């Protein structure tokens, strides 16, 4: 039995072939998948897939590269969305200074909110870190 603990089944190039990708994973012995969100606009799609597929679970979070696009993201939004029974983690979140895609202070602020949400819900946090 294998578990894919970090996949992005809703990414362009994958979502168009989602049924085939899921079938291949299952045929290869993957019995569960955690579909990770990286932007708020993905949350409903990630959760929707988890509702449709019994072996797919969801996370809610904002990737550090997207921090500038989510100014004001707070713990309350994360907690509210993570109340869905198919959501089993908070993230992907963290700090990524390598590509300099988002302001460092905004990344730190968002990361803190994710940590608060993880503590409040008791859900594990998915941390992305680079440089």
Segments predicted by a language model, with ranges:
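Mid-domain alpha/beta scaffold segments of enzyme catalytic cores
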Residues: 1-131
């Amino acid at each position: 039995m294998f578990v894919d603990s970090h996949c992005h089944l809703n990414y362009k190039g994958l979502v168009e072939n989602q049924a085939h990708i899921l079938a291949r994973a299952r045929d290869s012995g993957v019995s569960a998948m955690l579909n990770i969100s990286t932007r708020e606009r993905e949350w409903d799609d990630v959760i929707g897939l988890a509702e449709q597929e019994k072996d797919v679970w969801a996370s809610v979070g904002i990737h550090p590269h997207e921090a500038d696009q989510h100014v004001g993201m707070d713990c309350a939004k994360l907690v509210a969305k993570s109340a869905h029974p198919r959501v089993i983690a908070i993230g992907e979140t963290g700090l990524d200074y390598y590509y300099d895609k988002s302001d460092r202070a905004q990344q730190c602020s968002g990361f803190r909110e994710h940590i608060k949400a993880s503590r409040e819900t008791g859900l594990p946090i998915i941390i992305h870190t680079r440089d």
